[in-house]
Curated annotation (Swiss-Prot):
Pfam families xrefs: Nucleoporin2, Nucleoporin_FG, Nup96
Residue stretches making up the Peptidase S59 domain: 857-993
Name of the protein in question: Nucleoporin NUP145
Record carries keyword DNA-binding: no
Listed GO MF terms: hydrolase activity; nuclear localization sequence binding; RNA binding; structural constituent of nuclear pore
PTM comment text: NUP145 is autocatalytically cleaved in NUP145N and NUP145C.
Enzyme class: hydrolase
Sequence ranges of Basic and acidic residues compositional bias: 826-840
Skewed-composition ranges (Low complexity): 437-459, 518-535, 814-823, 1025-1037
Acidic residues bias (residue ranges): 999-1013
Positions of the UniProt region annotated as Disordered: 404-583, 740-859, 999-1043, 1066-1097
EC number: 3.4.21.-
Amino acid sequence: MSFGFGSGGFGQNNNSSTFGGFGSTPTTNTGFGSTGTTAFGSTSNTTGGGLFGGGGGGFGSGNTFGSGFGSKPAFGTPATTSSTSLFGSTTTTAGGTGFGSGGFGSTNTSSPFGGGGTSLFGNKTTTGFGSGTSTFGSNTGGGLFGGGSTTTGFGATNNPGIGTNVGDPPGTAVVPFSPTVEKEVNNPSQSNSYQNILFMDAYKKWSAEELRLADYNQGRKTAAPGGTGAFGSSGFGGFGTTSNTGGFGSNTGGGLFGNTQQNTGGFGTTNTTGSAFGSGGGLFGNKPATGGLFGTSSSQPAQSGGLFGSGTASTFGSSNTGTTSTFGSNNNTGGGLFGSNNTSSKPAFSFGTSNTSTPGFGTATTGSGFGTGTTTNTGGGLFGNTAQNTNTGGGLFGNQQQSGSAFGSGTGFGQQNQSTGTSLFGNTQQKPGGLFGSTTTNTSGGLFGSTNTGTSTFGQTPATQNTGGGLFGSKPAGTGGLFGSTATNQPASTGGLFGNLNTNAQTQQPATGGLFGNLGQNNQAKPSLFGTSTTTGGGLFGNTNAQQQTGSLFGTSTAQQQPQTGLGASLFGSSQQQQQQPQTFSTSITDISAYGATTLFSGLPDDKIQNPGPLATPLSGKAKVKSRSILPMYKLSPANASRLVTTPQKRAYGFSFSAYGSPTSPSSSASSTPGAFGQSILSSSINRGLNKSISASNLRRSLNVEDSILQPGAFSANSSMRLLGGPGSHKKLVINKDMRTDLFSPPNKDKQPQEDGTAARKTVTKRVSFDTSNVETPEKTIESSIPATDDSGYLKPDARSTANGTNGANGAKSSPVAAASPPEMEQVKGKELAVVHEEESPAPAQTDKPRGSQIEPGAYWMSPTADDIRAMNRMQRQRVVGFTVGRENVGSVQFKVPVDLSNINLDDLFGTIVILEPRSATVYPNAAKKPPMGKGLNVPALISLEHSWPRGGPTIKGRRLERHIERLKSIPDTTFESYDPETGVWAFSVEHFTTYGLGDDDDYDDDDYETEPESAVKSTPRPVTSPSISKSSTSPIDPDDTFEFRRSRRALPGAFDDAALSDTDEVANHAQRQGTLSPEPQDADTPLPSREWPEDESMADGLDEYQLEAYEEASQQGSVDEQEDFLPSRFAADNDAPQVPAGIMRARMRAVKKLNAPTKIEVAGGDDWTQILQASVKAPRTMDRATLRALNESGAVWEMKDRGSPPPQATATVSDGMGFATSIDLMKSLFEQAKAPTQPALTTSGKGFVKWPYEQRSKTDTEENLAVPRTNWGPNELLISTQHNEPNLLPVDAADDSATSPSTLARLQQYINLVSSKKQLQRVAGPEFRELAQGDSVWELAALLFDDNGEGVSQFWQQLVSEATDRALSFTAGLEEKAIICLAGNRVDEACRHLLAAGNFRLATLVSTIGKVDNKDIRAQLKDWRESNVLAEFSEPIRAIYELLAGNASVCAGVKNVPIENRVNSFTISQRFGLDWMRSFGLRLWYTSGVIPDVAAAVRSFQEDIEQDREPEPDSALWTLLKAFASREYDWSDTRLGWLLTKAIYTTGKVSFGEDALQKLDKASVTFASALTAASHWVPATFVLLQLSDPASREAAVRDHLGRHAHRIGSPRNLMSPFFTLQKFGVPEAWIWEAKALDYRSRQDSQQEFLALIWAQNYAEANRTFVTRVGPDLVIERNLPRLFAFAQLLFKVKKHLPNWERSAAVYLLYPMAVMQNQGSGKLDRFDNQLIDGLVALHSQTHGDIRQEAAIADMAEELIKCKGAAAASDPRLLQLLPQDVRGKYLRAQVLEAF
């Protein structure tokens, strides 16, 4: 609301509203103290103030922006003040003005007129009028006219209203309610209907609280026709009961002019006590029940007179009835200081009175000082007149037809009468407003802008269009007054001086801010003259931008929220921020006529109830501990359901006012912001959809049906419960799958809570779980790190601290008081449903993880860094060497070759192009954007993945570790580099990129779950955190005995020890067992808790793990398949039934357990709860014991082992009494001779609708193994076979050996005769020949593959699976399933006939072309169906047929992460329809390998599925042949096998390769050695060359080979060098040194070359090297000792040197002549020999400058040593250079003369 100036000052947002004068809580800017940079205040953050105080503007601002009225030099305000009010300061910084410590800018703690400091009018200790701390007698506060409990300017601020003498509220029974309709100005055809009684003319003068109080006083407290309104007690408006103190009313003390007995407000409240100038006990008169400064609405008689008014007559004016206070009173007595009144008192400043008496500043008949008018009014306040008289004259600020006060008349702060005149500030045709604002539609602009309809001083709420523009901007509709306006939803049309405010206000948003604060909420940022107001503005008297409660007149008073004032202290003081009472609408619960006539609600029945329940909901406190149950009590007790649920459904508009908006109402609990009307019936209730299972009147119920999965009437047979959605029968439980889908959808981890309170709320995603703890948790908010219990579905929510306040009740913002209470989940102590907070995901169930898996992935990194790469030029970026991308705690990708980064955005590299996840690395996840191989990053690379431990973590050792490493080595398309068991780093190389890694399901098969031999016997169960399942920990139990596992089990005589076969379902995820929704993916790398039975001593002494493994393998391979059971009991028909030994107990008990135990259903992660419920209901249960025994004995139980949906078969009827299935039968088998049943028929149970998910199985446990028993030839050509799937040796009667029975031998002889006569063995022969026929099939397939290159395999395979196809068709019922069985047997025509019979003509047409046309269109169609969520409408057989049409014979992919009704499960075609491996391979052979069947492609496709555990590994000779054929592509460069076989065959002497056999062998050796050399294996190649038969060729080849690799031979001193390997191969050492000499020569190391040649015994080459290079170099270097030493080496072998005397001997004689015969003066024999050698050597230099220089040097040295004898020798002189020779000749001539 605005006090004046129409639009609320300068730079107003016009978005403020809330009813009430001075108690609103605006959040927008005002002209006087906004948080934006407006004209009079800068952008202070937290200490907003008003015009005369505070940090935001006005007079005495300490802000950063000096406004015109708030600069520091102007009024002496220091910069450190936080709020400075006009009449008092609240800070401690010094700095006084002319008015003492108060005034305009003082920052002392004293008040201006009697504060603590030395001021103009008083000091701190001695006040002017004797009061304790204030000049005017205030005891506690620093108010000017009477202190309150707060140090404000004018007293208390108990949210007083600004109302004047408007009379008492009449109640709501006077005028019937009718909606107020107003037409839009811009669109006359559109009307606005206000469904609020306060908009009616008869009630608009009063607030809802006043009307309600009047109804209460008149006795209307219930739903009677004359009842009162239904608003309850709230803080709506400025008349609440807040405890703030401020302005003009004191809480405790008496002021100068009167004592305030009971918290009077500043501007006229409805309290019973007086204010500063009208209360009793003061200097100027005591009035116990008078009003405030500007007039009150009290009607009590005055008690005594004061200085300016007495009880009988006033000093300055008389009155007939009573006294008037100084500034006006409601009493009809005496006059006040400035005027007299006979009928009622007038205010002190009669600016608008029109009484008959003559006030001080006005006449009795002509109106107020600023306007004339006829007067019949009895008096008015300072700011308003209560009369409704006609005003005929024009005032200074506008024409007023009826007596308007200075600030408006009529209602206290706004005139509502017609006006015809114009004013200085604009024309006001209707209802002149107050001093600064008009309330009518303006047709012309005034000085300060046009003022529109109905804007009173304190704000009106009309919605009209402004047409004119003013100096400060035109406001289109409902500009506010001084205290703010509440114009609704009108756009601004013009811009003013201080900013264009043409931004549309939000609906029901305040439009303006007032002088005393902006009263808006959630304003938008709008520009002003001095800047954009980025935060909400403060008013002149303080900003109160709280979001819910309205504030007081001079301060902020919020309810349970922190004060959010923008500019600190206000002019009249800041509020104490005391907590208000909670908003509870506690009145008029059943009154439907609160808003008018009952016709409005006539169509609704009466909603009166006997016990409405509590009207207030406590915000804190612990809930009462209740007895725990899975469902609420009213759901468990159908008899009480109607009493608890079916409350009277009689509500106006479908909801109850008593509960609406409270925390317990459905609308509040579903909203994230209670009290913000987020779920109101008028606005945003559409944000939350109503589910089908909840009736349309769910808002009327007192119990919330959303707390449970089931409907309230699910278990009730009462017919009335059908209205609530109940099934109406105890026997029929209807589960609505569409109810609350968010309860069962997987949690969204990426979901972030909404921070913006005004943003649209999404659908609430509550989750339910069962609280299993009766222990009260401590009241503290901590991070939940307690692991969830293993056997409960309880998901403990995060009790994290409410940093942003979103952990309140039901997701509401938590208040400071509520924050101390325990979290909501911890308050619930019963077994009722616990609601997890809406904005949070439930914490995952914590389990102990192996070391390393707890490390979270870190940040990405690259080398070189991104900055270094960006600094490169384009050419450099095209070849970045050593580029590596990594991620902390995950791994790295190092590219082996230079990569081209010129076309790669480095910002998209991390997480988009290169994705590094734990145990996985992906480059180019989008295949469409992947460049060709060798381009971009799709190049060879080295990948290192951390934490690649086995499932058990780094502690796994032994065979499991070895298998893990083998698994790593077998990853396709990768080259294993290394694996570090300690760190878990797995390094491997790839040639191109896709997704590489180790999935959690890729670690082990079930035979990997072994434990190391335990050294000690444990008597207690191992903890569930163990990652492995003990082989000897699971004891077979009787499935009928539920508590069998609690008993101590002992080993039975003759039986195996309790070591259960570890299947994958035993180590399934624990969360799947419980049926709960785990927030983590089901394949997370977490240890799988084992379900172990208690161990005792009898379990410790069992089989060793290797024996156990062998036993399991034999057990699985000896099992029987249901479709190829070639060994029924007829096989042993000639013999007596074998005895049932105790040793086979374990296998049989496991079979019975498989069928008889409660079925363990696993649903993949993310599936809905209904599948678990349906699976548990429809899953197979206990069977007839006779049937179980029959199946067990016949071996048919193995048909259903690890099957998802076993095919139906005929039911067997076998007499009870044979075999065993319980412990009783087991005992009989141990001590009695039990017989097996004779020839039982093969039976299986019928298929149920529940499909088991695919589970990992051992490669040895396959259908082929189950189908064919292991048969082998024994001694004496006897056929040995295991019988009845038993791996152990059967007890055999010595007198009757079944292996040598005549029948068996007769069948063998018959088969031999057939084969020898070359007759075709029919595969459809009797069972006794089937296993023999398989051997014949192997030979036939081998001939087709290797003789005919695979031609004819298709027809052969169709004939091979023909019998299995016929048998499966007889067991299949559905036509679509029969079509798939036919397709598996390549019977396309028959499949089309089945589809035509089913009426699916289009699909039959497509099937007729299967395998013959391109299937890309079908693949595209399937993709579209999957993306559009249509696959849910298809049955699984239809989906499988379409997948086959698309060329996919493996897995039908499902659809996840969609609503439940659109989810589709994945399944493997072969497992879903019970296909064996041969028919599954046939699907790939006929339909996926192309138009012409490609056997090799089909084999590779099937092998890939086997490696990915989609298909079992066949144990068949047929599959071995197929793999050999598919991998027969020969690499002609690889001659290893040919060389080895050739050598091996030739050395036997039994095979000859012809006359040139040796040449052929040598050629193979040379070829193989060349291949090895090309592969850098030159050392093994040397060994191959040594195998050459011809010695000369062998020597030449080896020496040549060594010469080419001489640089790799190494030093003989290094034992690890190839030097010693070559010696071990038998390579002569001379050949090795010769090769090394070549290496030294290439490096120009002549001395080492010389030595190597010496050791290679190549003396001639050594001599040549020494004479040409080594000797001359040593002579020139003057290294005579080494020269002599090297020459001695040749001297020792001079017999091998024919030219010794003329070559190397020179270098031996020269050092001897120089060192031994110096200065002798004569030449001896050796000297002459040396000279001859030099002459001979000189003739061989051939111009070599090195040799010539050495020879000249030796000749000159010899002349120097021998003197004249040598100098006179012409042989030496001719060896010298010409200049040197001339020197010696001249010397001889001179000596001669």
